Regions:
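Amphipathic, Lys/Arg-enriched alpha-helical "gate/interface" segment within cytosolic domains
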Residues: 2-133
Length: 133
């Protein structure tokens, strides 16, 4: 599988798997604000540029999001990503229970917007599911 790094910093790495047309990110440590928004915007642009519709989120190291990031995700990220073509989301859930609550909210929001969401405990299982679609 051909994997290209689109963004890499101390908080997060975003890749694009060209053979399977999958956007993939891995959170390395707590992320919020500008770095989070930049990563989500990079992923959305990858969906748009490549006509991709699958995203693997490895959010095991994610923490709870502040209200302003939750609002930004609702107002900006969700509609933009769906418009860019996002249809399938493999979500590796955060280890922290409080962060899982944020993800459950996002799951419901994206499902309502037409994105099929499956949750996983490891990224390999999520990738396998996306590759099967």
């Amino acid at each position: 599988m051909s994997k290209t790094t689109a963004l890499s910093n101390a908080f997060i790495t975003v890749w694009y798997h060209s053979d399977q047309k999958i956007v993939h990110h891995q959170i390395h440590k707590y992320i919020c604000g500008s770095p989070l928004r930049e990563a989500n915007n990079v992923g959305t642009e990858l969906l748009r540029q490549h006509g991709a519709c699958k995203w693997l989120s490895d959010d095991r190291n994610a923490g709870p999001l502040p209200p302003e990031d939750l609002q930004w995700a609702h107002d900006v990220f969700t509609p933009s990503a769906v418009k860019a073509g996002w249809k399938y989301w493999a979500l590796v859930l955060p280890e922290k229970a409080v962060a899982q609550m944020n993800m459950k909210r996002f799951q419901a929001e994206f499902a309502q917007a037409g994105v099929t969401v499956q949750t996983f405990s490891d990224p390999e299982a999520g990738m396998t599911w996306l590759e099967s679609l």
